């Protein structure tokens, strides 16, 4: 089923070239279907890449999806034009009275900072608190998962001795939970992070159920409040060349990133 986006969203043309059914508001109003309303708080630096990755994933549902992109007003994006943000994104103050079926809060390249040092932390905590009353289910990705585990449950992150980078094998813990229905018993997923929330700390938190984990990468997937909060420590949205791009970016910046771990060949 289609994903509804603004007619002139740049990644719309790419999605259509991949035979992904996307439509704009003009066409959507003629369909007598109640769409799923999804909000995406995109904190990633390359916002158009993340838009494309997440819209690809959302297009796999059998339901019509109405997507709204949210930005933080307290941060000035360095890699995305102001015109793009003003055209295709909304600010929290303009949507705080709305209700959504689902929300995705992405990762962000700020994990080596203390949470309170991030310039938009206060705004983010207000948004996370707002999801408790205005969003049916919220998915937190990578740093977003770390931020939410810290904000809601006081679970602290810690630095890793080396960047956790590449594809890693994971195992499903509880097949009775609908969220992991259809998962293979073991599956590969990408990670790209300098920090982690220790899995033993998460295990000790009675509010969070661990659904998938890795012997090498630690915690991967969990939920709280019967699925109203979903935590993903990796990057399931990444496409096949994203890790390669990050590897070359890091090395060009004189930061020596480890070669991506390729669990598929181990």
What are these regions, as identified by a protein language model?
Residues 1-33:
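Short N-terminal or domain-adjacent regulatory/targeting segments
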Residues 43, 151-242:
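Pocket-forming structural segment of enzyme catalytic cores
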Residues 44-61:
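Short, surface-exposed "cap/lid" segments of acyl-processing enzymes
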Residues 64-76:
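A short beta-strand-loop structural module common to alpha/beta enzyme folds
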Residues 72-73, 100-110, 233:
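Short loop/turn segments at strand-loop or loop-helix junctions that form parts
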Residues 81-96:
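Glycine-rich, highly charged phosphate/nucleotide-binding loops
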Residues 105-174:
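Cysteine-nucleophile active-site neighborhood
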Residues 255-265:
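Single conserved hydrophobic/aromatic residue that forms the stacking wall/gate
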């Amino acid at each position: 089923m289609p994903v509804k986006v603004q007619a002139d969203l740049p990644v719309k043309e790419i999605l259509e070239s991949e035979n992904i059914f996307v439509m704009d508001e003009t066409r959507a109003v003629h369909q007598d279907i109640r769409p799923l309303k999804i909000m995406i708080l995109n904190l990633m630096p390359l916002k158009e890449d993340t838009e494309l990755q997440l819209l690809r994933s959302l297009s796999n549902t059998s339901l019509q999806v109405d997507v709204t992109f949210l930005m933080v007003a307290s941060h000035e994006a360095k890699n995305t034009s102001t015109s793009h943000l003003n055209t295709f994104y909304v600010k929290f103050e303009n949507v705080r009275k709305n209700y959504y079926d689902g929300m995705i809060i992405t990762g962000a390249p700020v994990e080596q900072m203390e949470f309170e040092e991030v310039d938009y932390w206060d705004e983010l905590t207000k948004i996370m608190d707002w999801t408790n009353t205005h969003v049916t289910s919220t998915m937190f990705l990578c740093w977003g998962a770390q931020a939410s585990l810290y904000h809601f449950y006081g679970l602290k992150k810690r630095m890793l001795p080396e960047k956790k980078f590449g594809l890693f094998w994971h195992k499903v813990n509880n097949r009775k939970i609908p969220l992991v229905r259809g998962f293979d018993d073991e599956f590969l997923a990408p990670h790209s992070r300098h920090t982690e929330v220790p899995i033993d700390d998460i295990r000790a938190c009675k509010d969070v159920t661990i659904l998938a984990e890795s012997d090498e990468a630690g915690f991967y997937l969990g939920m709280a409040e019967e699925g109203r909060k979903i935590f993903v420590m990796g990057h399931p949205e990444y496409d096949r060349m994203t890790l390669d791009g990050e590897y070359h970016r890091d090395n060009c910046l004189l930061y020596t990133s480890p070669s991506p771990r390729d669990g598929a060949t181990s």
